[in-house]
Each structure stands twice: as structure tokens, then as C-alpha cells.
Design a protein with these regions (language model features):
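Structured beta-strand/loop patches that form or line metal/cofactor-binding pockets in enzymes
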Residues: 1-45, 54
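Catalytic core of soluble alpha/beta enzymes
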Residues: 176-315
């Protein structure tokens, strides 16, 4: 046992991308910079643990405020009883944020407690959950927000230099020729393409019919395989996901926006994904991701962690 002595939020801002990059112009109205939201938990033994919540990328001051709200309910309590502290956080937040923003801050604190406990025990975080059956995890390059062929080639060259064999691009239904060209060009590099349609950001999102028409049009131009379609319809369009999975011979995936294990498990039971994408910095922390992994195995659905935050969120998902 080691009591929690202090909890503090840390907001960081860093340069990100180039001011003329299409992603910056479309998604970052404040210019080429990104924020992340971290939590530092200090135990009475002096060990500090760090966690991250994805909310800090989008609403850093909201992240900070919720952490400050929750901290007094945890200080002085056992920092090693992580599941009990998780329940404490749920007691504070679930009435007004059963889903959504507070789940991200709960994630951050849970990750920080895992970090502090593993540091105290002088072991990698994953050993607190048992062990690992793998000694490495394959990654893919996430990009493809490009408006010129030269930009795509620049990203493909970078992936080749890093030995990365999979490349996720962003596309929507009017990107037929662009998608077909990238599929052909990537084959020259021995790189496979997955497509993120980003419909968790769209209102209204596109329909399953739109997606099917888009894919069929691409296939008329290019015979290259598409590895997966991510968030191809809106996050609440359960029937749309099912239709895509039943109609297209492409792996259908999603789930990065889901903020509770219960909702993710319900989706697994509905068999709407070929693989599912929980994020420890969103869904309630590392124990929540493990819960999703365990249920996914019973359904023979592959879990693939999502991480688009900072290094703490990436490492939490890695473990």
C-alpha cells in the first residue's frame, strides 16, 4: 500500500506540422500546434506516475478542471488499489458524464496509477496485468491527409525508410481517383493501404450506401487490396457498420470514440467489426482495454489499440 499524496494536471503544447499542411488548414484553426493533457500522481513513497487523457488534445482546460474536481476524492487513499480508485472516480463523475469527457480524465488517472504502481514494483506496466505473449507489435503509418502526389510520395518514402509496411490514409467518397492512385503507388513500395473515413467527425456522416459505391468505384480503377475501412459510417450507425461488414470484403473497424467497456462489448456482441479499436486514454484506462480484449477473444474479433495522443497515451496502449 502507498497512499496518494498529490494529483496535478499538466497541459503541454508543442509545434505540430506545417501551417500550410492540409490537416492543419482543415482541423487546426489555431495553427500548427497540438496540446495534450497529462496527470501526475505522486504517492507517499515518492514515486510519480503519469497518465494521459485524449480530451486534452481537444479541450485542455476542460481536462484540467475535471482533474482538479476529482483529485480531493482520491488524495489520502491507497494508490495501489487501482480498481477501487477507478470506482471512486466513477462515483464522482458518472452521474453527469457516464460517457464522454470525464471518461477521458478517469482514463488519465487510472493510467497514472498503473504507472506509479509498476514503477514501485520495478516492473513494466504490462506485468501488472499478467504477462505478454508477444515481444513486438506491428505499427502502421497514420497520415494520408495529402493534396498532392508529391506529398503522398514523401510519406511513402518515410514509411519505407522506417520499415513500416502499412499506411493509413484519410479519404471520403469523392476521393475515388485519389484513393486508386495511392493504392497503386503504395504497391511500388510494398506498402498496404487502409482507409480512415473519419465519420466520427462528420455531421451528418455518410451512409453505408455511399461507402459501398465509393469502394466499388475505386475497385473499377485499382485491383489492389484495401486492408481496412475505419470509422466508415457515423459512430451511432450500428446497422451501417453491419451492412459494410456483410457487403464488402474489407475488414471493417471502429470504436476509438467509445468511452466505456460496456458499450464496446455491446458492439462486439452485435458483430459489427472485424477488428475493434479501444483507446486506453478514452475508454477508462488500461484495465478497461484489457476487459475489451478479453471479450473480443470470445467473439474471435481482433483488438487493435488506437492511440493518437501524446507519448504517455501511446505507451499506455502499447502496454
Amino acid at each position: 500500500m502507498s497512499k496518494i499524496e498529490n494529483i496535478r494536471p499538466i497541459l503541454l503544447t508543442a509545434d505540430y506540422g506545417d501551417e500550410k499542411h492540409p490537416e492543419i488548414l482543415e482541423c487546426f484553426p489555431n495553427g500548427p500546434k497540438r496540446t495534450i493533457g497529462l496527470v501526475e500522481v505522486t504517492l507517499e513513497n515518492g514515486v510519480k506516475g503519469y497518465g494521459e487523457g485524449y480530451l486534452g488534445v481537444f479541450a485542455p482546460n476542460v481536462f484540467k478542471s475535471i482533474i482538479e474536481l476529482c483529485s480531493p476524492y482520491l488524495v489520502g487513499k491507497d494508490g495501489f488499489d487501482i480498481l477501487r480508485r477507478y470506482k471512486d472516480l466513477c462515483s464522482v463523475c458518472d452521474y453527469w458524464s457516464l460517457q464522454g469527457a470525464a471518461r477521458h480524465t478517469t482514463s488519465a488517472i487510472e493510467i497514472a496509477l498503473v504507472d506509479a504502481k509498476s514503477k514501485t514494483q520495478k516492473c513494466p506496466a504490462y506485468k501488472l496485468f499478467g504477462n505478454s505473449s508477444k515481444d513486438q507489435i506491428e505499427t502502421y503509418g497514420s497520415g494520408g491527409i495529402c493534396d498532392t502526389k508529391e506529398h503522398f510520395i514523401e510519406e511513402l518514402e518515410l514509411l519505407k525508410s522506417l520499415g513500416i509496411k502499412k499506411y493509413k490514409i484519410r479519404s471520403v467518397p469523392n476521393d475515388i481517383n485519389r484513393t486508386a492512385w495511392v493504392l497503386k503507388e503504395a504497391r511500388k513500395y510494398g506498402i498496404d493501404i487502409g482507409i480512415d473515413m473519419c465519420q466520427n467527425l462528420a455531421d451528418p456522416p455518410i451512409s453505408a450506401d455511399d461507402v459501398i459505391s465509393y469502394i466499388n468505384s475505386v475497385k473499377k480503377i485499382s485491383k489492389e487490396k484495401i486492408l481496412f475501412l475505419e470509422e466508415a459510417v457515423g459512430p451511432m450507425d450500428i446497422n451501417g457498420f453491419k451492412r459494410l461488414k456483410e457487403t464488402l470484403k474489407i475488414a471493417i473497424c471502429g470504436g476509438e470514440v467509445i468511452t466505456t467497456p460496456l458499450e464496446m462489448i455491446q458492439r462486439l456482441n452485435l458483430d459489427i467489426y472485424n477488428f475493434v479499436q479501444p483507446d486506453a486514454s478514452v475508454i477508462g484506462g488500461m484495465h478497461a482495454v484489457k476487459e475489451v480484449f478479453e471479450h473480443a477473444k470470445t467473439k474471435k474479433i481482433i483488438p487493435v489499440v488506437h492511440a493518437w495522443g501524446g507519448p504517455v497515451a501511446i505507451m499506455a496502449n502499447y502496454h
